[in-house]
Amino acid sequence: MQVDAMSDVALFVHSTGTGPFMWTRLLAALPSGVTALTPTNLGYSPATAVPRGQVSTVADEVAHLRAQIPEGTTGVHLGGHSYGGLVALSLAIELSLAGEVAVRSLWLYEPVLFAPLMAHAESLPPDVAQDVAWLDSDPHFLHDEHGGSEAWLQGFVDYWNQAGTWAAMPEKSRAMARMVGWKMYQEVRCVAREARDFAHYQFNIPMTLLRGEHTTAPAREMAQRLAAVNPQAVLTVLPGVGHMGVVSAPDLVAAELAQHWGRVAAL
């Protein structure tokens, strides 16, 4: 992809089991001089397939996405949803340390970092602790033998939506999920085992954090804890939606992204 000399890009990282399509309705009003990048995650295309049994890490994802940033880019705005939020945070750290491209801002819808919640289970609210304990103790969810299987996919999709969602999905959508089931499992393993403590993700750039009113208790806690270590962050609760609000309520989310661009421009 070509970008104009001295150009900024806005790179959006999609969530587990979705794709770049989730960003389409959000990109109608990018700031002047900013080019959108919506790459496909590692393993979601035949060229980058992750075969069953192969471990895929956050570092692998970051390297894959970093390679998508065109030569000549001067600044990067990073966005992400769920697992994509963890990757966006990690990419922001790597780019900042490298010093090659300035990270301008972060816009994240419910970034998922289960690992630091698991590490501090004793300090969690009861409803959060209950969910986290289930994820850590479930005999199937974080075990390679079952990861990405039909039963695993059903459990994953129903957890982030509601019971029966997997069964109600069109067969074409279920078939596509099966094709990337192992990589989906690897992404869940990353958020549960590789995510660092919240204090690791401290920045001094504009940050917007969004969560749905009806999201899960852990997702609520993750957003709050990430905001606590980033006092400059704006944390907004979107009424009437849950974890998948980017897909289910794109106009509502797009309005919040427009607010983010306004805050960035005002600095």
Which residues does each PLM region occupy?
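Short beta-strand immediately N-terminal to the catalytic nucleophile in serine-hydrolase-like folds
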Residues: L78-G80, Y109
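Flexible "cap/lid" loop of the alpha/beta hydrolase fold
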Residues: E100-H143
